[in-house]
Amino acid sequence: MAKAKFERTKPHVNIGTIGHVDHGKTTLTAAITKVLHDKYPDLNESRAFDQIDNAPEERQRGITINISHVEYQTDKRHYAHVDAPGHADYIKNMITGAAQMDGAILVVAATDGPMPQTREHVLLARQVGVPYILVALNKADMVDDEELLELVEMEVRELLAAQEFDEDAPVVRVSALKALEGDAKWVESVEQLMEAVDESIPDPVRETDKPFLMPVEDVFTITGRGTVVTGRVERGVINVNEEVEIVGIRPSSTKTTVTGVEMFRKLLDQGQAGDNVGLLLRGIKREDVERGQVVTKPGTTTPHTEFEGQVYILSKDEGGRHTPFFNNYRPQFYFRTTDVTGVVTLPEGTEMVMPGDNTNISVKLIQPVAMDEGLRFAIREGGRTVGAGRVVKIIK
């Protein structure tokens, strides 16, 4: 069957829902798709709650990551929306999902107000570089007391300000459940939320002018056509028939040619920064490429094993370690799409690092990773996120 071409007429924005597990992230995601489908039926298909909630499991290193991708459009923009429904691993995996957001909708239940997870998500959003957060004050139909709503709103604004997000961001009172049920007042609340998303999340500054780079998330074999790697283009543009290099993890890099680009199961002539695409690679076997590598313009990215990083170590309350760590600590460093074990050297004069500390560390990785200064990473122990940081200096 011939594939339809993907029309690139509107700005494309990656967003997601973050927040405490029972506050209604998934219900809100379903409500947004339904309300936009009803408002712009030509532009959107509706997605049922259970289609989103039964997110495909992505198993990585023995951890189950549930992430659901939906797409929808407003008059102004085309959105790709990620939601990781209520799984206990949500927080640990936020680093993988949140890295793909140009903005986030923080879902806070008006009935509860901000919870510890709410705080942790906002903190992680800051660490992984989500540029903008606005707020959906969900379950607002269940709170009659105007003063209580204002109090919760104030708390949420303080929370945003504490992590240097815009404390004047829109806070929209919604009821995702009532909107799904078709209650006119609350349908309108979701329309208002999406207007706020359109207006407040800045147009992403796409990195289309930089050299092409795409982290590999998954690898497939398509019978008769070859090997496809999927991921979100981090920067630059890739055209069909361009040469690329596969860098990182393995001792040596591999060159190949891109023979096809697909997005949302539609063919493109090119993929550009911010697009989730599949690239068909010429002459590459399934086992020649793996998650954690990057596909890049030849000669523009180099793999490294030693670097200095500026890190924040989660406190016990944020779900982090309960005890300090010392020199030669050996956690996993999660870069883009995969974990690599590394050995930590503490700065001169520092005996140990406590949960809740900010510090600089030197790291020696056991496998090379394609990196530049400014690249962010998570620090994990057996799949549990215990810290986050960014590369400040490459040593080797």
From Swiss-Prot:
Organism (species): Mycolicibacterium paratuberculosis (strain ATCC BAA-968 / K-10)
Record-given protein name: Elongation factor Tu
EC top class, as a word: hydrolase
Record family assignment: Belongs to the TRAFAC class translation factor GTPase superfamily. Classic translation factor GTPase family. EF-Tu/EF-1A subfamily.
Matches recorded under PANTHER family: ELONGATION FACTOR TU, MITOCHONDRIAL, ELONGATION FACTOR TU-RELATED
Binding annotation for GTP: 19-26, 83-87, 138-141
NCBIfam families, A to Z: EF-Tu, PRK00049.1, PRK12735.1, PRK12736.1, small_GTP
Residues annotated for Mg(2+) binding in this entry: 26
Region (G4): 138-141
Keywords associated with the record: Cytoplasm, Elongation factor, GTP-binding, Hydrolase, Magnesium, Metal-binding, Nucleotide-binding, Protein biosynthesis
Residue span of region G1: 19-26
Annotated spans, G5: 175-177
Any one cellular-component term (Gene Ontology): cytosol
Protein's job: GTP hydrolase that promotes the GTP-dependent binding of aminoacyl-tRNA to the A-site of ribosomes during protein biosynthesis.
Region (G2): 62-66
Region (G3): 83-86
